[in-house]
Amino acid sequence: NSHSVRSSPTLRGKALRELFLCQKVPDPPPNVDFSALEEAGDVPTARERLQVHNSNPSCAGCHLITDPMGLSLEKFDGAGRFRETENGVELDISGELDGIFYDDVHGLTAAMRDHPKLSACLVNRLYAYGTGGPVELRYDRDALARFTTRFAEQGHKLPELLRDLALSEAFTRVRPPEAPEESVVNAAKPPQSQVASTAR
């Protein structure tokens, strides 16, 4: 979740939101102007470069929920190498997650761990992976609720969740295919007039 030559706090924060909290982050507007960010000149750190987002109302809404998380991972550059500085400037990796402020990546980890959406999202992700997904709430809602409750009761222990999933009916039964809609069936049949003319 980085660009080809540099890290991307925005992409990293977006990945954390979507993969671990199951919160969809909207794509940027089609007319967004990236030039202000790309032409940041001699601004030394990503934190300073990304300040441009806060001045644009069409960008600020989403970047406020991605950038603070991603900036906490800035001690890993675009290739994943550990670093203490960027362009000679010591990195500030403090951040915020939904009102929880922290000083470093360990604080981010704790904030993610305690987030109210993490548990249900992990259950959803593992259930979808284990059953071949995607999750369909009209069929899977009750099962997901049960697994989420059990996961909490067991102290959020991942091995126990995996065991429950593997022993569930979702792994031992196959959902029958749905009957095709009437319009689809009729569309597959040739008109009676065509059948009659073919038979002559």
Label each PLM-derived region with a short phrase.
Residues 124-132, 143-150:
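Extracellular low-complexity, Gly/Ser/Thr-rich intrinsically disordered linkers
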Residues 182-187, 193-199:
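Intrinsically disordered, low-complexity segments enriched in small/polar and acidic residues
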Residues 1-105, 109-113, 117-119, 138, ...:
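Sequence context surrounding c-type heme c attachment/ligation sites in exported
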